[in-house]
């Protein structure tokens, strides 16, 4: 219940007027609000303003004015001494109001300090008023259909009791009701009364409330990179108009069509016309490029550097040190992208996930539910299971594919589950989980089942750990007892998961299956973003991590542009140095400044510890000589006109590199080529300027694959051949006045540039695979990975020269490829006017194992002119109220990047501690400059005129200083035993020993009994791809109800499906054997008699071989006679007729035809699987929400098979459903030959 409070009694002061102006620019919302409060008490009171902060929200301006005195705020460093007087209170957990220490300071816990802005406003006179002005910027959430959801903070629209009743409205919808078209009823219709809204007062959470109605004025300007297809509001009637000074049709003005009744919050839904296309938004800085250059050159430290060393690269390095401080001064590009994942059907057979189950002692009572969840997983997923008490004991050293052996071992381990003694340590379990190595194309999902209620301090540390690793996994938490709701809800909210709480008498199975359905929904993982910028620009990219995207998630990336051509000297002859500097979101400190390397030297760098989850940054390099006056181009552009063979494009791109021919020819064209160039150097931070050097021979170690580590790459990363830079329309000029050689230079300006990519360091699993050059297309198969290290050997990267093996004799040279350098003294041909600068962005990712690609571009002529030396057009006057929203969000993202680097990793070495301190300093400086919130800064009330701290103002402190999480890295954390405890596989699991949950051998060494487990270097084993199975995730199927005659039978129970589920194989099939017959309670003879395969009926007596399917007509179920004669008859033991093969290789057995043992086993397994599906529909229909995924996996396996004997899937399922009708007749002792219906029509 945020708002303005009197801290002595924490009573809210009433709001009398709310004035709100907003601007929605794509997915970014800027808000300027003016709130007027009244003091109803007869004496003056102190004021404390409480404002709830959304995730990634920045409050850039605050001012409280009362009686001519204005109070503002500024961010200062959070010192440990500030919390000294607060430590005696101990950490608070969920207190409804701020506590007070012995010195009278207001004390907030860490979670409250992160999610709430609490500022003293000064004294309010008796019966006086106070006006609070607020400026904020935030990111708008999106829905799966791409709709943006705008919800104003409730402090701007608090709930108030209804005013005097008006004339009654007629029931239902009417034409004169402005809210009827939006489906919004009146207050009486919704039954919303002020008494129902009453709740315990909590100043940190819940909707804001006001004791009396107030006036409300609202106006929102909606603009963006695309047109708006529509807008609606579930709460209010809206009016949309064109603003009087709108520059395009993409800008509209939204106001309220009727008065605000103070009974609900304001919500608006924006429908973009291109909801699932990437968009780029450009926002100019507060200074032009010339003003920024003059500002930097006027600095004394820059002048000292210039006197010592006039090298241009050193000057660029100086700028890089200031990039995070000068974000507000330079232009910013924002990338927004909401992929269309909701339209993709739930293909259970192609969903790739890594699932980690974390169980504490309370999970022992829910073994059946855990077994059901494990059995419901698709075979291509990775799985691991760990139990935790005081210690964490995983079953496997790393996650393994869901093979038959692995699933059987996990299920047997769950049956004999013994949880380590001691209270459950959720922090240790999550620390182990996030420290596991990531697997490419396998987004991680955590399933935490616990009843733990940790202390408040442990809860805060656990939430902080998940905050810094929230991009690595989604957490689905299940509270099995009197657990801490704040902990589980916080974990799920931070990781975009979901929290479930089990009430007494409730079953866990539906909750687990529902969470599994959400975990297996379509996802876009392993996302990389390549930014192509002009040569004269350095860029700062943020965020440094790109998590996997699920339906409703959107990718927001920011790129701050810095023009450095005025600082970097141009080499003579149009030749560029081999290396240029690039900027990332993390920058080197002065002591790490790289010196200008001499030609022939190799830049060096250091890489980050692997446990921090970061990937080394790479250097970028120019692709073109920028001196247009001294370089010549050819007429034919190999990108647009590669010659007779379009596949030769990459060859010519390779030849065009300056390293190919250095002395006698000059490059004619340069493009962002996918082919290799000089090797890249790695650095734990974005490198400074490296001098001219020869990078040949540089082959840094390749860091592990990480999901979403953002950095820079040399040139265009490998695998980007589907996205060449487009050639813009050439500027008009006189053709007759120019030579033929000059005509080919029209594409040079757009093609010259540099690629900045994120994230780097991923292995190219299938090198040399060509990709389709189509926008937004699905690429055909695995492709070279973005950000690949380009300096690796030929054996590591495949054919580095060409995209595919080709005959060099077929390589045809396009005309005018090379032109000779004009002799000295000769005038060079006249220059062509350069093209306008552009920025091009390429987004790549994996949906399952299918590569995806999107691209988008934007012109930069509004910033730096059209490129011909003329001044850029003057931008339209922009109202200062919006306060550079994109810049503020960029700065907030940079702050989070540096906070993660400072807090995530350990500090075992001096280098680690120095690196953490530098990141802490950058986060601190960026936060102070841009007003972005940080855990290293705290807001302090100051006088708005003098900017001095108010001496008598109420101080707000945090009970805990910001420090790294109290757990060391996962590799050194709570796994006390030297070897990981595992199990003995010889003949099942041994009974659990008192030492832990899993058994180990006498020496304590791990025993790998699962076939050939995946090793960390080889990655997970993947089963062969299967045809996708369409699974409807969003609606319930209408299934057959149990037979009324069997209602009192044990077969009619709704929850007796677990014996059958236990028999399901990992691919989804069942075996036709004695255990299966016992699970479905149908004799083996009846199953064989009702089988549509003749081989099963032939195994019975000759009299019954043709019954009952002789009535189906010829061709159905009639196999080859040779097949029936060579098929072995079933034994009377435990093995059924289908238990001939080992059960593996079902996908290949279908191709063997109906002959041999494989065909016999396939017949038995397909018939048993169809019977199992029909049995679940007839016997356990009421428990559909529990066995839904199990049945979907079985159905997916059935659809992937090629049935023998000419039988199709529909006939097989019809035979299985008809079996239960036959069972009814058999139970009633009827003669089958007297039946007057055909089972094929059932």
Curated annotation (Swiss-Prot):
Listed SUPFAM superfamilies: vWA-like
Name assigned to this protein: von Willebrand factor A domain-containing protein 5B2
A Pfam cross-reference name: VIT_2
Domain VIT: 1-138
Organism the protein comes from: Homo sapiens (Human)
Amino acid composition bias (Low complexity), ranges on this chain: 588-604, 681-700, 1125-1138
InterPro entries, A to Z: VIT, VWA_domain-containing, VWF_A, vWFA_dom_sf
Sequence segments annotated as region (Disordered): 569-650, 670-726, 751-794, 957-976, 987-1055, 1118-1159
Highest taxon, organism lineage: Eukaryota
Polar residues compositional bias, start-end: 605-619
Domain VWFA: start-end pairs: 354-527
């Amino acid at each position: 219940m945020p708002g303005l409070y009197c801290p002595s009694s924490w009573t809210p002061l009433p709001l009398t007027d709310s004035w709100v102006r907003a601007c929605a620019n794509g997915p970014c919302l800027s808000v300027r609000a003016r709130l007027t409060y009244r003091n109803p008490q007869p004496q003056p009171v102190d004021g404390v303003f409480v404002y709830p902060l959304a995730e990634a929200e920045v409050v850039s301006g605050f001012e409280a004015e009362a009686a001519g005195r204005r109070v503002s705020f500024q961010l200062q460093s959070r010192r440990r001494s500030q919390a000294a007087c607060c430590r005696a209170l101990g950490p608070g957990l969920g207190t409804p109001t701020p506590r007070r220490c012995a010195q009278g300071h207001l004390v907030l816990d860490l979670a409250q300090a992160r999610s709430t802005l609490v500022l003293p406003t000064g004294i309010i006179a008796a019966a006086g008023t106070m006006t609070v002005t607020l400026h904020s910027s935030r990111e708008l959430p999106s829905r799966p259909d791409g709709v943006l959801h705008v919800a104003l903070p409730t402090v701007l629209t608090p709930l108030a009791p209804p005013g005097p009743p008006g004339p009654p409205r007629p029931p239902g919808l009417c034409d004169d009701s402005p809210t009827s078209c939006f489906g919004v009823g009146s207050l009486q219709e919704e039954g919303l009364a002020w008494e129902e809204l009453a709740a315990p007062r909590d100043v940190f959470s819940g909707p804001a409330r006001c004791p009396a109605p107030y006036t409300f004025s609202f106006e929102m300007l909606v603009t963006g990179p695309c047109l708006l297809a529509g807008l609606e509001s579930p709460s209010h009637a809206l009016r949309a108009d064109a603003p009087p000074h709108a520059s395009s049709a993409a800008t509209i003005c939204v106001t309220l069509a009727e008065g605000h009744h103070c009974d609900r919050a304001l919500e608006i839904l924006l429908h973009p016309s291109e909801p699932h296309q990437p968009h780029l938004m450009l926002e100019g800085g507060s200074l032009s490029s010339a003003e920024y250059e003059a500002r930097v050159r006027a600095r004394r430290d820059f002048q000292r550097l210039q006197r010592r060393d006039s090298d241009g690269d050193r000057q660029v390095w100086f700028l890089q040190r200031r990039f995070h401080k000068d974000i507000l001064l330079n232009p910013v590009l924002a990338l927004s992208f909401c992929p269309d994942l909701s339209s993709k059907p739930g293909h259970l057979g192609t969903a790739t996930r890594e699932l980690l189950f974390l169980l504490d002692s309370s999970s022992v009572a829910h073994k059946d539910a855990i077994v059901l969840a494990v059995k419901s997983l698709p075979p291509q997923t990775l799985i691991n299971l760990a139990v935790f008490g005081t210690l964490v004991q995983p079953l496997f050293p790393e996650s393994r594919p869901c093979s038959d052996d692995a699933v059987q071992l996990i299920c047997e381990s769950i049956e004999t589950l013994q949880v380590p003694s001691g209270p459950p340590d959720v922090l240790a379990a999550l620390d182990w989980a996030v420290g596991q190595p990531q697997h490419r194309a396998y987004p991680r999902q955590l399933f935490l089942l616990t009843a733990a209620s940790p202390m408040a301090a442990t809860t805060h540390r656990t939430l902080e750990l998940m905050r810094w690793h929230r991009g690595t996994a989604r957490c689905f938490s299940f509270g099995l007892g009197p657990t801490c709701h704040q902990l589980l809800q916080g974990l799920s909210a931070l990781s975009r998961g979901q929290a479930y709480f089990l009430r007494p008498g409730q079953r866990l199975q539906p909750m687990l299956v529902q969470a599994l359905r959400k975990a297996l929904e379509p996802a876009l993982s392993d996302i990389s973003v390549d930014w192509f910028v002009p040569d004269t620009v350095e860029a700062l990219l943020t965020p440094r991590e790109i998590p996997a995207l699920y339906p409703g998630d959107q990718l927001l990336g920011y790129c701050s542009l810095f023009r450095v051509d005025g600082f970097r000297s141009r080499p003579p002859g149009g030749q560029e140095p081999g290396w240029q500097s690039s900027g990332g979101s993390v920058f080197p400190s002065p002591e790490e400044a790289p010196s200008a390397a001499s030609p022939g030297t190799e830049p060096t760098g250091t890489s980050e510890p692997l446990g921090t989850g970061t990937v080394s940054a790479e250097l970028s390099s120019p692709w073109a000589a920028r001196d247009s006056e001294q370089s010549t181009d050819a007429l034919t552009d190999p990108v647009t006109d590669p010659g007779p063979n379009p596949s030769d494009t990459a060859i010519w791109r390779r030849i065009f590199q300056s390293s190919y021919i250095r002395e006698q020819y000059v490059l004619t064209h340069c493009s962002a080529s996918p082919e290799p160039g000089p090797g890249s150097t790695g650095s734990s931070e974005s490198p400074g300027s490296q001098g001219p050097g020869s990078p040949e021979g540089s082959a840094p170690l390749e860091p592990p694959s990480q999901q979403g580590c953002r950095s820079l790459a040399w040139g265009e990363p490998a695998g980007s051949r589907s996205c060449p830079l487009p050639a813009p329309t050439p500027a008009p000029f006189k053709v007759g006045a120019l030579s033929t050689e000059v005509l080919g230079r029209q594409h040079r300006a757009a093609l010259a540039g540099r690629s900045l990519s994120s994230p780097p360091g991923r292995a190219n699993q299938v090198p040399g695979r060509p990709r389709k050059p189509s926008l937004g297309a699905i690429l055909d198969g695995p492709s070279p990975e973005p950000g690949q290290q380009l300096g690796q050997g030929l054996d590591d990267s495949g054919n580095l020269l060409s995209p595919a093996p080709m005959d060099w004799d077929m390589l045809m040279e396009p005309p005018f490829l090379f032109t000779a350098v004009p002799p000295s003294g000769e005038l060079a041909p006249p220059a062509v006017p350069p093209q306008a600068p552009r920025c091009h962005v390429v987004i790549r990712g994996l949906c399952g194992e299918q590569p995806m690609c999107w691209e988008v571009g934007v012109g930069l002529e509004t910033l730096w002119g059209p490129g011909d030396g003329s001044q850029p057009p003057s931008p339209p006057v922009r109202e200062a109220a919006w306060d550079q929203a994109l810049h503020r969000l960029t700065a907030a993202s940079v702050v989070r990047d540096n906070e993660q680097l400072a807090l995530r990793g350990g500090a075992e070495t001096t280098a680690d501690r120095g690196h953490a301190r530098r990141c802490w300093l950058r986060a601190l400086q960026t936060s102070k400059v841009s007003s972005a919130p940080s855990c290293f800064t705290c807001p302090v009330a100051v006088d708005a005129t003098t900017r001095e701290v108010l001496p008598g103002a109420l101080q707000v402190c945090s009970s805990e200083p910001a420090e790294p999480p109290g757990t060391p890295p996962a590799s050194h954390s709570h796994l006390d035993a030297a070897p990981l405890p595992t199990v003995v596989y010889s003949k099942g699991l041994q009974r659990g020993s008192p030492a832990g949950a899993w058994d180990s051998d006498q020496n304590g060494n791990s025993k790998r009994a699962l076939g050939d487990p995946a090793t960390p270097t080889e990655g997970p084993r993947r089963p062969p791809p299967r045809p996708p199975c369409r699974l409807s995730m969003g609606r319930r199927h209408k299934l057959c109800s149990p037979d009324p005659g069997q209602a009192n039978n044990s077969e009619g129970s709704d929850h007796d499906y677990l014996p059958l589920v236990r028999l399901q194989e990992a691919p989804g099939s069942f075996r036709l054997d004695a255990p299966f017959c016992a699970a479905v309670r149908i004799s083996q003879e009846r199953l064989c008699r009702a089988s549509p395969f003749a081989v099963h009926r032939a195994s019975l007596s000759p009299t019954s071989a043709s019954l009952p399917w002789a009535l189906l007509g010829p061709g159905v179920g009639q196999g080859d006679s040779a097949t029936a004669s060579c098929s072995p008859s079933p034994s009377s033991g435990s093995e059924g007729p289908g238990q001939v093969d080992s059960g593996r290789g079902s996908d290949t057995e279908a191709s063997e035809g109906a002959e041999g043992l494989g065909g016999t086993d396939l017949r038995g397994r397909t018939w048993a699987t169809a019977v199992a599906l029909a049995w679940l529909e007839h016997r356990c229909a009421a428990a559909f929400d529990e066995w839904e995924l199990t049945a979907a996996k079985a159905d997916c396996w059935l659809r992937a098979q090629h049935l023998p004997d000419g039988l199709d899937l529909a006939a097989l399922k019809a035979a299985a459903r008809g079996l239960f009708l036959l069972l009814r007749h058999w139970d009633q002792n009827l003669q089958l030959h007297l039946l007057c219906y055909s089972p094929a029509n059932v």
